[in-house]
């Protein structure tokens, strides 16, 4: 047995990030880039009304749009068998505003027409201003520009059980003209398309989904905005789909998105993580038409770190599994069956977006831990402003690794499928590294030397 001694390098310490985006800051940032007068895309139409308006836990018929209310039973704190249909973009389903809790037990809400803002009475179902809304056994469909099926905002809680939510936007897949105001379509760096999101949680609110289906035609199924402190989306045993384009979930700074035992079928990404937020996925079955995850940051602070945990489940993607663009991340992959058609497991690159968050001094970098798994795919680090730190813990990795600092525990092995270049941290037995004939594994270590590997490749140690 031959042991190789690694370099004694230390990963930079994580620094505290204090940046919290308010709605006003987000609006100002986007308007600074757009021509013409300032535009508040958060603001709903002031003329909008909901078929069922609830104020401080009480049904308010005088504030409701009776013409859109086709049927249902109103009780204390509850509406049952609600039927709503409207097509003017200004009339919504259920609007719960203020303190108190309201329950919808059975609903069929069908809305169409172009909408303004995020939330507001024209939404399929919305809770705001400190309220709680519980929805059971509902079908909510919203069609039209920026027409949301559900929204939770301004310190509220939404819980959805055994329901189907969908949004369709306006046509965009065949070259149709698209709106040009800020945030009526996704920012180009997201590499997606569409003009409506099915659900959004924002401004210190929480949303929980159970045994439900969330479908977006384009842009997004589950989205977050402007946390102003803390935002949470949690989906349990759900099906999350984007049909033509878009992501299943977005993590804005200060936001937390957790998918447990979900089936995700996304036209583009399963999730996009922007800035300092958390994305956790446990025992999910995921298929993506582009990348599995995109991690990036704009308008942010250099200290921001994205926290990503993928535990169990199965992930398949057409594009590189994980794309990291000028981003500090803390990524844990644990016991996950993950593969990409491109053969690339993780690719980190420099973000050419002029709005990309600056790098700062001693950046935390890209920290990846792979635990209790067998994985195939290349890991390629080409962001020259940050370093990658790869830890293998009871893991077998088959693929090239380039540009990373690598640490092994005694139960881990690496089979390099093509020429690789890494820096070794700690000590490793030569028998833990292998490569086929014709492949050279270059390791920057605490010593120099050359070893023939078991499958015919060569291990070159350089200082």
What are these language model-derived features?
Residues 39, 43, 54-55, 102-106, ...:
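Long, compositionally biased, intrinsically disordered segments
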Residues 54, 59, 74-81, 101-106, ...:
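All-beta strand scaffolds that present successive hydrophobic residues in beta-strands
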Residues 50-52, 60-70, 88-95, 116-126, ...:
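Extracellular beta-strand/beta-solenoid scaffold signature
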Residues 9, 238-239, 248:
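Sequence termini and other peripheral, non-core segments
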Residues 83-133, 137-142, 148-152, 158-162, ...:
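Extracellular beta-helix/beta-solenoid repeat scaffolds
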Residues 9-16, 34-45, 53-61, 96-98, ...:
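Mature extracytoplasmic/periplasmic regions of secreted or cell-envelope proteins
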Residues 150-153, 200-201, 295-298, 321-326, ...:
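Sequence/structural signature of small/polar-enriched beta-strand/turn repeats
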Residues 4-6, 22-113, 458-463:
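N-terminal segments that cap or nucleate solenoid repeat domains
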